[in-house]
């Protein structure tokens, strides 16, 4: 990735972040490519995308793109490397939030020994850009100090 050239470091850890459906992508890209990405900040995520389809069962394409579906089948080097990564789930519990989405993927990851953490900001934080604008700097600040 160009970031390695820009930072003049071949082994710099690359982090990803996203909110709402972007939280899905942030977590999924770390799970798919642990050789490239080291951390994900997934804010107010939606992880079970089956509810947005008309299909009753996941298709093969779905199984390879959804961490809820492909992580349980991981093994070998890919899983070993993923166990050295970290996914931070952060969510409010206010309007339009569903912390259960974060817990569902966190539990799947935990069953495979993949480091993750769910952090609830409580009922005063809604599924909204104001929430994410407060969340992102907090975690980036913590991560850059560690």
PLM features: what roles do these ranges have?
Residues 1-146:
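Non-catalytic cap/lid and distal C-terminal segments of serine-dependent acyl enzymes
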